[in-house]
Amino acid sequence: MKIQTEVDELGFFGEYGGQYVPETLMPAIIELKKAYEDAKSDTHFKKEFNYYLSEYVGRETPLTFAESYTKLLGGAKIYLKREDLNHTGAHKINNAIGQALLAKRMGKTKLVAETGAGQHGVASATIAALFDMDLIVFMGSEDIKRQQLNVFRMELLGAKVVSVSDGQGTLSDAVNKALQYWVNHVEDTHYLLGSALGPDPFPTMVRDFQSVIGNEIKSQILSKEGRLPDALVACVGGGSNSIGTFYPFIQDDVKLYGVEAAGKGSHTHNHALAIGKGKPGVLHGSKMYLIQNDDGQIELAHSISAGLDYPGIGPEHSYYNDIGRVSYVSATDNEAMEALITFSKVEGIIPAIESAHALSYVEKLAPNMDEKEIIVVTISGRGDKDMETIKQYKENGGEQNE
């Protein structure tokens, strides 16, 4: 079966993607697409990107054999792709560097970004400081409450954080505000979008910058095991760490599992199952799977993890779901939290709650596989930012009512 791995001339993967933006934004989108295509074929740009990934972020990140976790679960050998060890503690910095270098190349002096968990905001603020650019970060009021530490980090790095109380005050609302701001300041400002979403060329750019994850996994597993893994597992919100993990393996005989956040359960209205329970629609400039009611109104997404409560999933993921190339599965709040607690005790690594959704699925997958088989799971970020949430969960006696 032929898999489409690049957008068509209108910016679509199959029927997903496109450029659903107001006319006023089209010149900026066209300018960005052209600049990105030029940069992509420029060896100097690639060199510069790789220089900062190595010297500033600390790449490559290890691919660690999780010996104790493998023993505990029985079955497949489990390797961890350690994106938690990047500077700033998550995968978000890979994309922030790429886009900031592109913005500089385009002569932009200012950046605007949205953030949910605050990790993309922190990565953007870090890079804005490094490259001496102004940054405004829009963040939902609800997320600000959950992620006080990251708000302080962004401000310490010199960014201006603007609270968004529209809607339910989460990531989706922050994206709306960031897009509006960009429309009005497009001459000197680049919109540093943090996930594989939005109008073309954003999903492709973000995927390309994050593909360093999957490319490293490929060379690392070949040198450690002499072959490709049998399965890759990553959590999915908008979908940037997962698309970066999966993309280099799309044409290979490797099973791919994207783990969505089932929140309080798929039988409730409190989940973020864009593929599991959603249907195609348009949001934030792109056609993709969305959680919506019968009238096509976007429903509010819920997850205990601030980075996964987005009501959509990027267009490339939407396409891979339809053609059956990636299996989209899910983990509830409780399943993710229990996996986080187990994994921390067994491996001495406290993952972000987002990443714990992926681990929760590994706990189901590994025991049903042969011990000669190999799973690689992407630990998209570290859990420092989630201490308050984890503490509350444990104080409430663990399992929340579902």
Swiss-Prot record:
Its biological purpose: The beta subunit is responsible for the synthesis of L-tryptophan from indole and L-serine.
Catalytic activity entry: (1S,2R)-1-C-(indol-3-yl)glycerol 3-phosphate + L-serine = D-glyceraldehyde 3-phosphate + L-tryptophan + H2O
Keyword Lipoprotein belongs to the record: no
Residues the record lists as N6-(pyridoxal phosphate)lysine modifications: 92
Keywords recorded for this protein, A-Z: Amino-acid biosynthesis, Aromatic amino acid biosynthesis, Lyase, Pyridoxal phosphate, Tryptophan biosynthesis
Cofactor(s) required for function per UniProt: pyridoxal 5'-phosphate
Pathway membership: Amino-acid biosynthesis; L-tryptophan biosynthesis; L-tryptophan from chorismate: step 5/5
Family: Belongs to the TrpB family.
GO CC terms, sorted: cytoplasm
Tree of life domain: Bacteria
Name by which UniProt lists this protein: Tryptophan synthase beta chain
NCBIfam families: trpB
InterPro entries linked to this entry: Trp_synth_b_CS (IPR006653), Trp_synth_beta (IPR006654), Trp_synth_beta/beta-like (IPR023026), TrpB-like_PALP (IPR001926), TrpB-like_PALP_sf (IPR036052)
Enzyme class: lyase
One Gene Ontology term of the molecular function aspect: tryptophan synthase activity
Annotated source species: Staphylococcus epidermidis (strain ATCC 35984 / DSM 28319 / BCRC 17069 / CCUG 31568 / BM 3577 / RP62A)
One Pfam family here: PALP
EC numbers: 4.2.1.20
Oligomer and partners: Tetramer of two alpha and two beta chains.
UniProt entry tagged with the keyword Transmembrane: no
